[in-house]
Amino acid sequence: QDSLVGSEMCIRDRNITDGENILENVPVMITPGQAQNTVGMAVGYGRTRAGKAGDNVGFNAYPFLNTKELTITKIEGEYEFASIQLHHTMMGRDIVKETSLAEYIKDPSAGNHRELYHTYKGKLPANEVSLYEEHDLETGHFWNLSIDLTSCIGCGECVISCQAENNIPVVGKEEMRKSRDMHWMRIDRYFSSDMTKELSKEEKISAITMYSEMEVPSENPEVVFQPVMCMHCNHAPCENVCPVAATTHSNEGLNQMTYNRCIGTRYCANNCPYKVRRFNWFQYSENEKFDFHMNDDLGKMVLNPDVVVRSRGVIEKCSMCIQKIQELKLTAKREGRPIRDKDAQTVCASSCSTNALVFGDFNNKESEVSRLRNDERAYDLLDHLNVRPSVFYQTKIRNKA
């Protein structure tokens, strides 16, 4: 939000001037795919009358819009960016499964390889092997969320709507640098790498060298965006380790938080393979340091009264917008009708401009989410862990023709 995006392989401060206007100490973030000898700078920042939340954030790029001659000077110094994601390639893992359009036309399951594991019953996929006593999810509702990686463009609408709907505090760059992010959902971005496992075998490269080169994005990479939130696992690792039963499983397949039970051990966050649980390090709604319209009587009117404001020392996470589900149930009951497909919507799904996110009741066999779950493109993130998430993904299809 307050930097140049550059192509040169370094991160240093810069001075920018067109002879009349000058910006000093502008940090540069190196981004793969940026054309050589070019920089990009976001507009809309550097405001002086936006209020406490927006004043003096970033740099004002508008004075340079009509200039023909621009000088960028490298200066000494470094800048610590507030970036959540520290890894930028998948390093050969199938976190994002993808295929080409040509391959998908030939085989709808292309790119969606499912590993089989040795058991006493023979080779089986992970979701058919279990030591757990199964939940009864065939009766009533079973809420699922589908995410189409082909449609997702990484715009962040879902993150912003989730933030507003669920009273999630904005903690600022200083806290983000300490990995104290509070977003209930994040959008992971991965660049492609020139090094692959197949290429390493051909060139007989050692594993250490292969993975080191896999960390480096291609000069002109392909990019994929992947929204990640609480997966509402049916074999949830977080539920097993909570000593006070603050996180439990509902009979509708949702992983629930009881905030007034939570004592902040953070065992659940440690045990979550998706790293989607957030800890309240401060009483954000009362602390003046985080005064973004939450600390005065007028500002608190912006908070959603249907969602409790969490306290210091409490873990929080995606609730699958349970307040909207409960509101829908009451509405359907008053009207004397069953719940229809698409009646229930999480705010991330309803705000998505590309319809990449689809929410619904899997037990309604006519629902769109039920159809998508049974599609050959559907897969679970980290399916080898067999946590059986209620959030699933659709294989990304690239048109490389």
Feature names for model-found ranges:
Residues 33-45:
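Short, solvent-exposed secondary-structure boundary/capping segments
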